[in-house]
């Protein structure tokens, strides 16, 4: 077989539908849009979520809760993610940001206890779970308030 003899298998490539090109094509005259009406017009159609004038579901359902403007955004970092740092290094918010473990604007860092850690690290965080503290101290490291 030569490169110039290559061809796609039958049915792999279908011809595009040429709409509005005469009655013999099967897609002539109205081009599959039916007769008149909003959906037959150029640019016609209803917006997403429109239910024909009936009260839409997003307005039938009640509002709930509120957005607390004083809420603090705390970034969560697991113990297993700290394993990428070298032994005896200081892990603080700046180090976590450099390692791309936290991103964006955060008001604090919380260390959680998922996973294992083997190297001794000095971790500076705003919050931590008891299990995270145990694992860090068991590995020979220490955890301090940032």
From Swiss-Prot:
Name used for this protein in its record: Large ribosomal subunit protein uL15
Q: Where is this region: Disordered?
A: 1-58
Signal peptide range in chain numbering: none
Q: Where is the composition biased (Gly residues)?
A: 22-31, 42-52
> Which key words are in the record?
Ribonucleoprotein, Ribosomal protein, RNA-binding, rRNA-binding
Q: What does this protein do?
A: Binds to the 23S rRNA.
The organism is Desulfatibacillum aliphaticivorans
Gene Ontology CC entries for this record: cytosolic large ribosomal subunit
Family per similarity comment: Belongs to the universal ribosomal protein uL15 family.
Q: Which GO terms describe its molecular function?
A: rRNA binding; structural constituent of ribosome
Spell out the HAMAP family in the cross-references: Ribosomal_uL15
> How does the annotation summarize its subunit structure?
Part of the 50S ribosomal subunit.
Q: Which InterPro entries match?
A: Ribosomal_uL15, Ribosomal_uL15/eL18, Ribosomal_uL15/eL18_sf, Ribosomal_uL15_bac-type
Query: What Gene Ontology terms for biological process does this UniProt record contain?
Result: translation
């Amino acid at each position: 077989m030569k490169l110039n003899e290559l061809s796609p298998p039958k049915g792999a490539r279908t011809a595009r539908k040429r709409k509005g090109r005469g009655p013999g094509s099967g897609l002539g005259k109205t081009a599959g849009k039916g007769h008149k009406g909003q959906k037959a017009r150029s640019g016609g159609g209803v917006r997403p979520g429109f239910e024909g004038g009936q009260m839409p579901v997003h307005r039938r359902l009640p509002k709930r809760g509120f957005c607390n403007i004083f809420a603090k955004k705390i970034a969560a970092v697991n113990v297993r993610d700290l394993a990428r740092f070298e032994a005896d290094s200081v892990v603080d918010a700046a180090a976590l940001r450099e390692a791309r473990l936290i991103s964006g604007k955060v008001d604090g860092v919380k260390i959680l206890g998922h996973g294992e850690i083997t190297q001794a690290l000095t971790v500076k965080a705003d919050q931590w779970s008891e299990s995270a503290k145990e694992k860090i101290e068991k590995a020979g490291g220490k955890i301090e308030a940032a």
